[in-house]
A protein has these predicted regions:
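Short amphipathic alpha-helix with an adjacent loop that forms part of the alpha/beta core around
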Residues: 21-22, 54-63
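Short active-site oxyanion
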Residues: 24-30, 45-46, 91-92
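Catalytic cysteine-centered active loop of the rhodanese-like fold, especially the PTP/DSP P-loop
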Residues: 60-104
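A short, well-structured beta->alpha microelement
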Residues: 13-17, 46-55
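Flexible, polar/low-complexity N-terminal or interdomain linker segments that lie immediately upstream
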Residues: 1-39, 112-119
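Short loop/helix-cap segments at secondary-structure boundaries that form the rim of catalytic
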Residues: 39-45, 57-61, 103
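Hydrophobic/aromatic beta-strand patches that form the interior of the parallel beta-sheet core
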Residues: 31, 48-50, 67, 94
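Short, hinge-like loop/turn segments at secondary-structure boundaries
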Residues: 48-49, 110-114
Length: 119
């Protein structure tokens, strides 16, 4: 799966848009595309895990509002998983391209084995 090839694309969201989505209280699925280790280490609270190949999509319905992210702008996993979801017919897919590093840079909470306990 090459995420840079043309085809259907997910909407890109930034940190403030993701914060607003969380604050709204409306249900959505926040999905981290990462290795098992990466997901266990640090993630945005409430995130679901999808492996970097997008192989385990159970728990996601085609009409769910879904935001996919990974570690940072250079990580291609979230772009690839977002593209795969759109190609599979998921209708409301967004891609938080800044990822975990952008979220942390904003001083926002994280959870996981490597998350600072003081946040």
């Amino acid at each position: 799966m090459n995420p840079d090839q043309e085809g259907p694309r997910a909407k890109i969201v930034d940190r403030s848009e993701l914060q607003a989505k969380i604050a709204s209280g409306r249900p959505f699925k926040l999905v981290m595309a990462a290795s098992d280790f990466g997901f266990r280490a640090k993630r945005i609270p409430g995130s679901l895990h999808v492996d970097v190949r997008g192989a385990n999509l159970s728990g996601l319905a085609k009409d769910d509002d879904i935001v996919v992210y990974c570690s940072n702008l250079d990580c291609k996993a979230s772009k690839a998983v977002s593209k795969k979801l759109v190609e599979l017919g998921y209708h409301k897919v967004s891609h938080y391209a800044g990822g975990l590093i952008d979220w942390e840079a904003g001083g926002l909470p994280i959870e996981g084995d490597w998350a600072p306990q003081s946040r």
